[in-house]
Regions:
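Periplasmic/cell-envelope proteins involved in peptidoglycan metabolism and beta-lactam response
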Residues: 1-281, 372-380, 489, 545-562, ...
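Second-shell loop/turn segments in exported
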Residues: 49-52, 80-90, 98-101, 121-129, ...
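Extracytoplasmic
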Residues: 56-59, 66, 75-77, 145, ...
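Soluble non-cytosolic domains of exported or imported proteins
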Residues: 58, 88-95, 130-134, 180, ...
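Beta-lactam-recognizing serine transpeptidase/beta-lactamase-like catalytic domain environment
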Residues: 70-72, 207-220, 259-301, 307-538
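Sec-exported extracytoplasmic/periplasmic mature domains
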Residues: 102-106, 145, 173, 195, ...
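Acidic/histidine-enriched alpha-helical segments
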Residues: 111-120, 254-266, 327, 391-395, ...
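Ligand-recognition elements built from short beta-strands and adjacent flexible loops
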Residues: 536-551, 555-695
């Protein structure tokens, strides 16, 4: 009986399952055929729901100078509009409005009057009124002009110092989709790093509204903001270079000019001013997209004698006291090499030949070396190839020489082409005991969290000359300045080499006009402890040697004054380079004892027992006398006496402490708001310092 009952129950269950199955099939068939559930049309319902994906834009990183002064940032931009025939307040006095806006928008009064006279509801005051900054907007708002209003645009890039270092910084433009794209200079080279990575958020919404459907999932990926880039440029020195180039352009009508200052020991580019330049806030001012520092190739002239003479010394082919007959030299093929002083200076020594820039002396030495040897030295110095500096469109020049005549002219910088950045790299051999150092322009890259992701540092390219060779070159480079009063600088010991190169004619041969030359100068100072290399070149300056030299020496004097580089303060230890270790988590007393012999200026912050932070970090280099900041695990911190500190040093001090900082002026600290020795309240205090230039 039990077995029969079980069978009946099983059949009943199977029947129920089958009925449910057919019921579900029937329901699904109904839904498919009718597109309805409980009277709701599914197609209409689905059509009313949409997946929205919104871009979360990353903030573009800023660009700073080496001392933390902002050079490029991202700001809101606006378009100036004028209501003419609207139901709002219209422009009441068109002539007065045009006259007031003309200087601010850099548009003619006539053009503005033309726009304001249109028979329209409103007009945009383009081009000058398009994409203006908040600073310009505020200037216009102060005028309280009736009928003038603003439309907010996409964000744009703003360059605080206009034409300042324009080819180095470059520019970025806002595209139609709102993205800011780097186009030139650092903005272009590091576009990806500055841009960061956009994020997004995805969610469901009804098409009838802009709101997210409640209780539905949202997929979000945060934007990763772009990193900030700190250049090696010192704004104070850059301003000096800019002033010098401006003089070359406007006083001497120079076709183009470049004035670059490089740290003699590390290769950091401290300043580089050029003509032409442009205002990156107005891309209409760009007439030339090539940077004269890295993209212009030219015959350098007699500055190349630094390297042909040094190569002869290195190869044992040079005796400075040996004499030769100056004036002219005839090569085997009949080519006559002449000195700039056609009659020559009589029979003179090779040392004097360098000081007087004798082409005959350079040719004689080059013939002793031969094509292969001189070519090898030029190649080892970095000519004929890119230096690899962090800028696009770097040219390589041409140092090819085959024949005796090409060897001769290459020894004094004719028949070969170089770039200014190559000259600076090669000159670094004269300040690093014969070792060539790679130039660089990025000091560090800092991500959105404040982490240093890249630290620029000294990079060795190749050892080319011995210490003995460099010492001899210093001796004869000093003579160049000693025998020529135009290159002497008060209170600054300077050595260098001048250059005057003929300019190749498109028709063959060379141009022959009065000013058809490229003038150049390579300077190193101070002579005993080189801190800076200055390289200057200009095409067709309409000036005398004295006027040309005065612009350069004035700039050198100002740079030396700013950097506190006088003969009385020179110290051989300043040239010593120290590579730092990691001192974090070490015992303070032990570490200070270890560092004593390195002659570093150590700023110990707090009286704790252990070191919890340092700057610069491990593997960074310092020169003897430069500051190393060490933060200890103290319970309280007292204010340092900051008098005489650079703003970069003050920023480092405040950053490592977490102390808020405000400053004004340029140069070195003159006064500070928190007295030295005062206990710091890091949460509530703000340090204010006033800077001034040294005299």
């Amino acid at each position: 009986m039990k077995k029969r009952a079980t069978v009946k129950i099983s059949k009943f269950i199977i029947l129920i399952v089958v009925l449910l199955f057919f019921a579900i099939i029937a329901k699904l068939s109904y839904v498919v055929l009718s597109n309805k559930v409980d009277g709701i049309n599914l197609q209409e319902k689905a059509a009313s729901i949409a997946t929205v994906k919104k871009t979360l834009y990353a903030d573009r990183g800023s660009i700073y100078d080496v001392n933390g002064e902002e050079l490029a940032s991202t700001i809101n931009s606006y378009t100036v509009i004028a209501y003419i025939n609207s139901n709002k307040t219209n422009v009441t006095d068109k002539e007065m409005t045009a006259e007031a806006l003309s200087p601010i928008l850099n548009m003619s009064k006539e053009k503005l009057m033309e726009l304001l006279s249109k028979d329209l509801y409103q007009v945009e005051l383009r081009p000058g009124g398009y994409g203006i900054s908040e600073v310009i907007k505020a200037k216009i708002e102060k005028l309280e002009l009736p009928g003038i209003d603003f439309i907010k645009n996409s964000k744009k890039r703003y360059y605080n110092k206009s034409t300042f270092a324009s080819y180095l910084i470059g520019y970025a433009k806002t595209l139609d989709d709102g993205k800011i794209s780097g186009e030139l200079g650092i903005e272009g080279y590091y576009d990806d790093i500055l841009s960061g990575t956009n994020g997004y958020t995805k969610y469901l919404k009804y098409t009838s509204s802009n709101y997210k459907i409640p209780n539905t999932n949202e997929d979000t990926k945060k934007a990763k903001n772009g990193s900030d880039i700190y250049l090696t440029i010192d704004s104070s020195i850059q301003l000096i270079a800019e002033k010098a180039v401006s003089s070359m352009k406007y006083r001497f009508n120079t076709d183009w000019a470049v004035f670059t200052v490089m740290d003699a020991k590390t290769g950091a580019i401290v300043a580089s001013a050029t003509s032409p330049n442009f205002n990156p806030n107005d891309t209409n001012t760009i007439k030339e997209y090539m940077n004269p520092l890295i993209s212009y190739q030219y015959e350098p002239g007699s500055v190349m004698k630094v390297f042909s003479f040094a190569s002869a010394i290195e190869e044992g082919k040079y005796n400075g006291e040996e004499t030769f007959k100056s004036g002219s030299y005839t090569l085997d093929d009949g080519t006559v090499i002449r000195d700039s002083e056609r009659k020559g200076w009589g029979t003179i020594s090779f040392d004097e030949g360098f000081a007087r820039s004798s082409n005959v002396a350079a040719t004689t030495l080059a013939l002793r070396l031969g094509v292969d040897t001189l070519s090898e030295y030029y190649n080892n110095l970095g000519f004929g190839k890119k230096t690899g500096i962090e800028l696009s469109n770097e040219a390589i020049g041409d140092i090819e020489m085959v024949y005796q005549s090409e060897l001769a002219t290459a020894s004094f910088g004719q028949g070969v082409s170089v770039t200014a950045i190559q000259m600076l790299q090669a000159l670094s051999a004269m300040t690093n005991d014969g070792t060539v150092i790679k130039p660089y322009i990025v000091d560090k890259i800092v991500d959105e969290n404040g982490t240093i992701t890249y630290q620029g540092e000294r990079q060795v390219v190749k050892k080319v000359y011995s210490n003995k060779t460099v010492s001899k070159m210093h001796e004869i480079m000093k003579k160049v300045v000693e025998i020529n009063k135009y290159w002497q600088v008060d209170n600054v010991s300077l050595m260098g080499k001048t250059g005057t190169a003929q300019i190749a004619s498109p028709k063959g041969g060379y141009l022959t006009g009065t000013y058809d030359y490229i003038k150049s100068f390579a300077g190193i100072f101070p002579t005993d402890n080189p801190k800076y290399i200055v390289y200057v070149a200009g095409k067709k300056p309409e000036s005398s040697l004295g006027s040309w030299a005065k612009v350069i020496t004035t700039a050198v004097e100002e740079i030396a004054s700013y950097a506190k580089l006088t003969e009385s303060k020179s110290d051989a230890d300043l040239t010593k380079i120290i590579k730092l270790d990691n001192y974090i988590s070490t015992n303070l007393e032990t570490t200070l004892e270890e560092l004593k012999s390195k002659k570093i200026n150590i700023i110990t912050i707090g009286n704790g027992k252990y070191i919890i932070n340092q700057y610069p970090l491990k593997n960074k280099t310092l020169l003897s006398g430069e500051k190393l900041f060490i933060l200890t695990n103290a319970t309280e911190y007292k204010m340092e006496n900051l008098t005489g500190w650079s703003i970069g040093e003050v920023k480092t001090y405040c950053d490592i402490l977490g102390l808020k900082l405000e400053y004004s002026g340029y140069g070195y600290v003159k006064s500070q708001s928190i007295e030295a020795g005062a206990v710091l309240d890091l949460e509530n205090m703000t340090l204010t310092v006033e800077l001034e230039k040294t005299t």
